[in-house]
Structures are given as structure tokens and as C-alpha cells.
Amino acid sequence: MASPSRRLQTKPVITCFKSVLLIYTFIFWITGVILLAVGIWGKVSLENYFSLLNEKATNVPFVLIGTGTVIILLGTFGCFATCRASAWMLKLYAMFLTLIFLVELVAAIIGFVFRHEIKNSLKNNYEKALKQYNATGDYRSDAVDKIQSMLHCCGVTNYRDWKDTNYYSEKGFPESCCKLEDCSPQRDADKVNNEGCFIMVMTIIESEMGVVAGISFGVACFQLIGIFLAYCLSRAITNNQYEIV
């Protein structure tokens, strides 16, 4: 059995770790809310662009929403484990944090490796959407119109891309390409936006996905602190229990 003085030295350490871990867990919970919000924001703000990407790319917002939800639940569990000062619950908390960190690390590596695939996918699908524009009532036709109207652009590389489409042969340029509301005759190149949409869309996606990547990286690194604190508090509680015995 440990001396009373030894136990008195251990208790302040446990109290200190509990206080710091509670503060950390609250901040960690907030990061979950932020990731959830970023995922929803990405789904809403990039929806038109994701319509022209492959299925892997469109899953990014859902991954963030799922990760944010898991972090919120895990943060709640971590707060409960810390308040209870349960050694095994804290070890479980540290294990879950480690698992999420590894998943985020793998996801970041996969995203970095396949980043060029997004660019190629966007260009190929955009060209395909132009060729099938208004022919099948495809949802991508609506995405093309929204992008061209919002960014004041026309075609993939430039407005000439439309001249190779069936739609142009029948009706000319779509109204979403027009500089003004009245664009007739719709084969007049002077009345449509000349710049292509591909570079503009890629700039927006890279910029906004950069924000998402930065936030995700910050959250992942922040988890290392939680792993360390949860492990240290668990050890301190376990040692204190042995000292009492």
C-alpha cells in the first residue's frame, strides 16, 4: 500500500489531466460540429460541380458529414469517460481517437493520389454533358446551365465547344451562354460569353476543397493531443488505484 503523501501527489495530477482533457474534449466536439457544417456546406455549394464529377468525388461531403457526426458522438463519450474517471473508458476513447486518425490519414493519402482523376473526370463529363445537352433531360444539363449562368462562361474550353453539339445545330448557343437576357440570334458569337467554364470550375473546386482539406488536416492533428491526454489520464488513474490497494 502506498503512503498517503504519495497518493496526495497523484490526485493533483489526475485533477489536472481531467481538467485539460475536458477542455480538449469540448473543443474536439466543436470540431465535429465544424466538420459536419463544412460537409453540408460543401454538398450545397459544390452540388452543381459535383454533378459533373464521378461518384467517388461526390462522396467527399458525405464523408465529412459522417466524420463530423462520429466525432460529435465520440466527444460526448470522451466527456462522460473523463468525468467518470474510468481508466478502461479512457483507453477506449484513446483507441477510437487513434482509429479515426488513421482513417483520416488514409483518406487524405487517397485524396492526394487521386486528385488528378477529379480534373480528368470533370473535363470528360463536362464534354459529355455538352454533347447530350437537352437531349435526354439529363440532370447534367441543368448543372451545365447553372454553372454557365453563375460563372458567366460558355463551353468547356471556350464557346466554340458548343458548335460541335447537336443542340447548336438545331438551336444555336443555349441561353445560359448569353451575356444578356436577349441573345437572339443564338448563333451570334458576339452575344455569348467567350471564356470556357472548365478552368473556372477547377479553380473554385481546388480553392474550396483546399479549405476542406485544411480543416480536416487540423482536426486530424488535434486528435493526437487527445490520444496523449486520454492515455496519460488513464495511466494516472490506474496507478492511483494500485497505490490505494
From Swiss-Prot:
<feature type="topological domain" description="Cytoplasmic">
    <location>
        <begin position="1"/>
        <end position="19"/>
    </location>
</feature>
<protein>
    <recommendedName>
        <fullName>Tetraspanin-6</fullName>
    </recommendedName>
</protein>
<dbReference type="InterPro" id="IPR048232">
    <property type="entry name" value="TSN6/7_LEL"/>
</dbReference>
<dbReference type="InterPro" id="IPR018499">
    <property type="entry name" value="Tetraspanin/Peripherin"/>
</dbReference>
<feature type="topological domain" description="Extracellular">
    <location>
        <begin position="115"/>
        <end position="208"/>
    </location>
</feature>
<feature type="topological domain" description="Cytoplasmic">
    <location>
        <begin position="81"/>
        <end position="93"/>
    </location>
</feature>
<feature type="transmembrane region" description="Helical">
    <location>
        <begin position="60"/>
        <end position="80"/>
    </location>
</feature>
<dbReference type="Pfam" id="PF00335">
    <property type="entry name" value="Tetraspanin"/>
</dbReference>
<dbReference type="InterPro" id="IPR018503">
    <property type="entry name" value="Tetraspanin_CS"/>
</dbReference>
<dbReference type="GO" id="GO:0039532">
    <property type="term" value="P:negative regulation of cytoplasmic pattern recognition receptor signaling pathway"/>
</dbReference>
<dbReference type="GO" id="GO:0005886">
    <property type="term" value="C:plasma membrane"/>
</dbReference>
<feature type="glycosylation site" description="N-linked (GlcNAc...) asparagine">
    <location>
        <position position="134"/>
    </location>
</feature>
<feature type="transmembrane region" description="Helical">
    <location>
        <begin position="209"/>
        <end position="229"/>
    </location>
</feature>
<keyword id="KW-1133">Transmembrane helix</keyword>
<dbReference type="InterPro" id="IPR000301">
    <property type="entry name" value="Tetraspanin_animals"/>
</dbReference>
<dbReference type="InterPro" id="IPR008952">
    <property type="entry name" value="Tetraspanin_EC2_sf"/>
</dbReference>
<feature type="transmembrane region" description="Helical">
    <location>
        <begin position="94"/>
        <end position="114"/>
    </location>
</feature>
<comment type="similarity">
    <text>Belongs to the tetraspanin (TM4SF) family.</text>
</comment>
<feature type="topological domain" description="Cytoplasmic">
    <location>
        <begin position="230"/>
        <end position="245"/>
    </location>
</feature>
<feature type="transmembrane region" description="Helical">
    <location>
        <begin position="20"/>
        <end position="40"/>
    </location>
</feature>
<keyword id="KW-0325">Glycoprotein</keyword>
<keyword id="KW-0472">Membrane</keyword>
<feature type="topological domain" description="Extracellular">
    <location>
        <begin position="41"/>
        <end position="59"/>
    </location>
</feature>
<dbReference type="GO" id="GO:0043124">
    <property type="term" value="P:negative regulation of canonical NF-kappaB signal transduction"/>
</dbReference>
<keyword id="KW-0812">Transmembrane</keyword>
